[in-house]
A protein has these predicted regions:
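Extended, folded domain segments that form the structural surfaces/walls around functional sites
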Residues: 36, 44-51, 64, 94, ...
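C-terminal regulatory/oligomerization modules of transcriptional regulators
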Residues: 1-3, 103, 107-156
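N-terminal helix-turn-helix DNA-binding core of bacterial DNA-binding proteins
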Residues: 18-55, 59
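N-terminal leader segment of winged-helix/HTH proteins
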Residues: 1-24, 70
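Residue-level recognition of short loop/turn positions
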Residues: 70, 94, 127-128
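Basic, amphipathic "hinge/linker" alpha-helix immediately C-terminal to the N-terminal HTH DNA-binding motif
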Residues: 28, 80-102
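Short, contiguous, well-ordered secondary-structure segments
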Residues: 5-8, 72-79, 97-104
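Canonical helix-turn-helix DNA-binding module
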Residues: 50-76
């Protein structure tokens, strides 16, 4: 990448307007980011977040509250027969838009941090069976898939 001419003197800075910095403020802890991952994987119930993330209930509670306050997640009431009403946690459209962010991080780190460049999971399009990945493209008609179109499998 290269800056356009007027930005090349390096006196200019994106500063507080940087969307990446704003996102990192929202995803400020490992637990918050893993809560997003688990939501993308379909986790919705508090106790399942605690178990799947592998951290304390207070840490998960703080993470879910932070995601809700930032507009990335909402609470949705549910009630099982004979039990008290409780809340599920679901990603908003803004939260679901983090799918390519998660996939880009996972894809890049699988390549460099995992033995043989392969992580424990692979992500495939349910319909075609093709692996799903993230690329930088200038094609406005490039194929896209949503989280609901992806099947997560163990890498073999």
């Amino acid at each position: 990448m290269e800056f356009e001419e007027r930005l090349r003197d390096r006196q200019w800075s994106v500063g507080n307007a940087c969307s990446v910095a704003k996102l990192l403020d929202l995803l400020s802890t490992k637990t918050v980011f893993l809560a997003v991952r688990e939501s993308l994987f379909g986790t919705t119930r508090f106790e399942d977040f605690v178990e799947r993330i592998g951290t304390s209930a207070p840490a998960v509670s703080r993470a879910l509250k932070q995601l809700e306050a930032s507009g990335l997640m909402v609470r949705v009431p549910y009630q099982e027969p004979g039990k008290r009403a409780r809340d599920e946690y679901r990603l908003t459209a803004a939260g679901e838009d983090l799918l390519p962010v998660y996939q880009a991080i996972r894809q890049g780190r699988d390549k460099y941090l995992q033995k043989g460049g392969r992580g424990p999971l692979c992500f495939v399009d349910r319909e075609s069976g093709n692996r799903v990945g993230v690329i930088v493209t200038d094609d406005p008609n490039a194929a896209t898939v949503s989280a609901g179109d992806i099947e997560i499998r163990l890498n073999r």
